[in-house]
A protein has these predicted regions:
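Rossmann-fold NAD(P)H-dependent dehydrogenase/reductase core
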Residues: 1-127
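C-terminal helical subdomain
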Residues: 107, 131-172
Length: 172
């Protein structure tokens, strides 16, 4: 699962869910449950949920405001959606073990990378130009998309990764 939006203005999905919550969490949940009948009995199969260390910034959950424009903060919505992804992965892993399915579930952080997911963040636009300043900052601070893909590749193929793990760049 690698769908995601980051810091869009307040929008709702067709299903009337706040966009970040709907895409980043509910989308993962629905896709995973749709394909689970195929995966669960395949030895070595894995559900890899791309997430982020942004979940560490969550400082409580306002359950009354999950789907509301009132007090909406686009950065908090992103952080919270990543926490929900990781909680979903841990819960999924527990259920897979209880039912003795062959599939494992893993959360994966690709590292801090400037890609199109950052399109709603003004500073990211500055860092995507070809100026000397942008090139230096990008080299010193951010991972390339190629480097970011390595964490998903590790989650997909490494024998040392166990179900329920949170792996990736900047995590272990």
């Amino acid at each position: 699962n690698n769908a995601g939006v980051m810091a869009p203005p307040f929008l709702k999905t067709y299903e009337n869910l706040e966009m970040t919550f709907g895409v980043n969490y509910i989308g993962y949940y629905l896709l995973t449950n749709k394909i689970m009948p195929v995966l669960r009995d395949v030895s070595g199969s894995r559900v890899i949920n791309i997430s982020s260390i942004a979940h560490y910034r969550v400082n409580g959950i306002n359950w009354d405001n999950i789907n509301s424009q009132i007090h909406y903060n686009k950065h908090e919505a992103y952080d919270l959606s990543n926490l929900f992804r990781i909680m979903f992965t841990v819960e999924l892993e527990q259920k897979l073990r209880q039912k003795n399915y062959q599939t494992i579930a893993i959360s994966c952080h690709p590292g801090v990378t400037i890609t199109n997911i950052c399109r709603h963040i003004p500073m990211a636009k500055v860092l995507q130009n070809n100026s000397i300043f942008a090139k230096i900052i990008n080299k010193l601070v951010f991972h390339t998309p190629h480097q970011a893909a390595m964490s998903a590749l590790m989650a997909t193929t490494s024998l040392s990764v166990k179900g329920g793990d949170f792996v990736g760049l900047d995590t272990k």
